[in-house]
A protein has these predicted regions:
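Glycoside hydrolase catalytic-domain context in secreted enzymes
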Residues: 1-214
Length: 214
């Protein structure tokens, strides 16, 4: 049957009926507690799996009903003016890495099969400005790229075995992230050994010619 890949679970299963709502990611990060966050993610995954079982049994495989959860957001919250900073675990790359790993492990479980499929987003250097995200070119030095923006994604791949990675809307150093050979092949696949699937942010492929003009 057809399967819709879009489901959200940043701090609870979203947009698919009643579910437990936990504090936003920035609030959960303030606990500095990896085990507690992993438990939160386990609850989210259990509810997502229960909803999926019920809805698929009824033949409902529409948007927000699947097991590919587009969470966590492991971007770095550098500028308080960024309107989506509350979705992140804050400004520290190390803390974001640790909490991202815990959340992913909680969502995916430790059984033979995935409980749900987590998605580390938005790869990479995606921290505003929100209004220009479809056309913005983020210029990051190699030092800043590897010490600030990539560690959480690297940990998600190498330590947590994240099943999916979402490309960002913006360009990074001239390349649209969702089509970047540097990010998606050289770093993600060849250097880190990622074996899962890559997903674009919503309609980001259209931005290649509509706003990035590449």
């Amino acid at each position: 049957p057809a399967y819709n890949w879009w489901n959200e679970a940043l701090h609870g299963v979203a947009r698919a009926g009643t579910a437990t709502m936990f504090p936003q990611a920035i609030g959960l990060a303030a606990m500095f507690d990896e085990e507690y966050l992993k438990t939160v993610a386990e609850v989210i995954a259990t509810e997502a799996r229960a909803k999926y079982n019920m809805q698929s049994a009824q033949g409902d495989r529409d948007i927000y009903k699947g097991l590919t959860l587009w969470s966590p957001n492991v971007n770095i919250f550098r500028d308080p003016r960024w309107g989506r900073g509350h979705e992140t675990y804050g400004e520290d790359p190390y803390l974001t890495s640790r909490l991202g790993v815990a959340f992913i492990k909680g969502l995916q479980g430790d059984g033979e099969y995935l409980k749900t499929a987590a998605c580390a987003k938005h790869f990479a250097v995606h921290s505003g400005p929100e209004g220009k995200r479809h056309e913005f070119d983020a210029h990051a030095s190699q030092k800043d790229l590897w010490e600030t923006y990539l560690p959480a994604f690297e940990a998600a791949v190498k330590e947590a075995g994240v099943e999916s990675v979402m490309g960002a809307y913006n360009r990074t150093n001239g390349e649209p992230c969702c089509g970047s050979k540097t990010l998606l092949k050289d770093i993600l696949r060849d250097t880190w050994g990622f074996e899962g699937h890559v997903v674009s942010d919503c309609w980001a492929i259209c931005d290649f010619h509509q706003t990035h003009h590449v």
